[in-house]
């Protein structure tokens, strides 16, 4: 058979007779594959661009030694080494000077060493990946380490306050003013060095995403979030409290060196500056408890988030709105959005997620879209929580 043209421009086939055979062999005359241009291949379909949204603006803290964690480890290791050296010196100096204030400062340095070692352990533990049991990973171990640091300082300070009170009641003690002055001067230098090591500058400049160790501002709030690694921040505040106490001990040692009869300055300085150390750790303790109690992040208010979700086109009501922190710098939100029957659920979900990410910096958002029902207005579980 061979194709034959028709008037319609299509091809038909007919039987090939003997007279159409060419050559001695009488084979079939086939249409050559090379006499006509090959038909063009069909074009591959172009990918269709679709609007895409996801529930994560930035990933939650990833397991492994990130640059921020490596920097925190270096800072804590260096400060811990400095602290150990000068703590040993203060123990010797305090013993030789018979100074309770110097021993108090040494005890605070001991608490610093313990808290820094605990922070290093919790920092290492936080690098472990999430599991089916620990679905958020071990990131909160860092917060627990900060809590242990504050609690240890408060316990040691309470003991030293008691000893200072006993010395104020009984004056049967002697203090070597020269040894106390020398040791106090070294202690001030040691605390200044540790504060310099642990000091954290502002967040590095970054394009496109927010760093792992800081969070953006809430739109219109003007209040920045806590900066820096949690463990380093707690250790830095801890050292600042010790620095204040060391300065007080230095002033007391100068007074005792020139006026030995004023030896009561030793327990008095211990009493006053221990209270300052307690007060300096109160903000850290407050922030830690807020995270552990699943409280609303300090830089995010409930009302602006609620109003932002209600302003999304198609949203009639919201309920089950929960805002909490996984760490000091990673916020999580969840809510139920009740929408009109004519609203597009996917469009509402995409717009609401985008607004939460861009305006408040939530790391993860879980939103459930459902049809609005009139009985929601009377449901107790659909009402807003009262003011604290």
From Swiss-Prot:
On whether Transport is a keyword of this UniProt record, the answer is: yes
Membrane topology label: Multi-pass membrane protein
Cellular compartment(s) = Cytoplasmic vesicle, Secretory vesicle, Synaptic vesicle membrane; Synapse, Synaptosome; Late endosome membrane; Lysosome membrane
Please list the residue ranges that the record places on the Lumenal side of the membrane. Answer: 97-105, 167-177, 257-264
Region named Disordered: 1-30, 35-54
| A matching Pfam family | Cation_efflux
Residues reported to bind Zn(2+): 108, 112, 238, 242
Question: On the Cytoplasmic side, which residues?
Answer: 1-75, 127-145, 199-235, 286-388
Q: Is the keyword NADP assigned to this protein?
A: no
Chain's role: Probable proton-coupled zinc ion antiporter mediating the import of zinc from cytoplasm into synaptic vesicles and participating to cellular zinc ion homeostasis in the brain.
Q: Which family does it belong to?
A: Belongs to the cation diffusion facilitator (CDF) transporter (TC 2.A.4) family. SLC30A subfamily.
Q: How does it assemble?
A: Homodimer. Homodimerization could regulate efficiency of zinc transport. Interacts with TMEM163.
- Protein's name in the database: Probable proton-coupled zinc antiporter SLC30A3
In the UniProt record, the gene name given for this protein reads SLC30A3
